[in-house]
């Protein structure tokens, strides 16, 4: 019902036409009500107020993100995030540059150390031999060199045992003869 009354009031104003007389409007320099010349004030003569001033614009977040550091291996990180935009319309926020160049290749590992000193299967000046022993425990006439690549005295003894011979360290192995032999 209120809507209908308002519609009727507006319609009657439109039909009535303009109000006689002119009313120059002066805008105050502050928010004080406007004044009108003597006579009837127009219907819309409530104090005129200008709209509030728009708020201050925010700071334009023009901070650029930092550059990524140089990576030691695998390249640096990309630049940091740009600063936040201030106010309604932030400034141009640029992300940082791509990460720095990748670091140099890692150095090559050093060479492995040499193996230990060669294994001495027999004391100095003695030659390893696999010999058949006589009944008295003295080396028989048949001796032969053990397999190559033996790495311990126990491997030397096992190698000779596989052939049914005994590991011996001989002073003079000549033509398959074991002379002056002893146990390793």
UniProtKB/Swiss-Prot annotation:
Expressed in the mycellium. Induction: Expression is down-regulated by carbon starvation but not by depletion of nitrogen. Induced during invasion of plant tissues. Pfam families: Hydrophobin_2 (PF06766). Keywords: Disulfide bond, Secreted, Signal, Virulence. It is found in: Secreted. Aerial growth, conidiation, and dispersal of filamentous fungi in the environment rely upon a capability of their secreting small amphipathic proteins called hydrophobins (HPBs) with low sequence identity. Class I can self-assemble into an outermost layer of rodlet bundles on aerial cell surfaces, conferring cellular hydrophobicity that supports fungal growth, development and dispersal; whereas Class II form highly ordered films at water-air interfaces through intermolecular interactions but contribute nothing to the rodlet structure. Disulfide bonds join 122-169, 130-160, 131-143, 170-181. Belongs to the cerato-ulmin hydrophobin family. It comes from Passalora fulva. This is Class II hydrophobin 6.
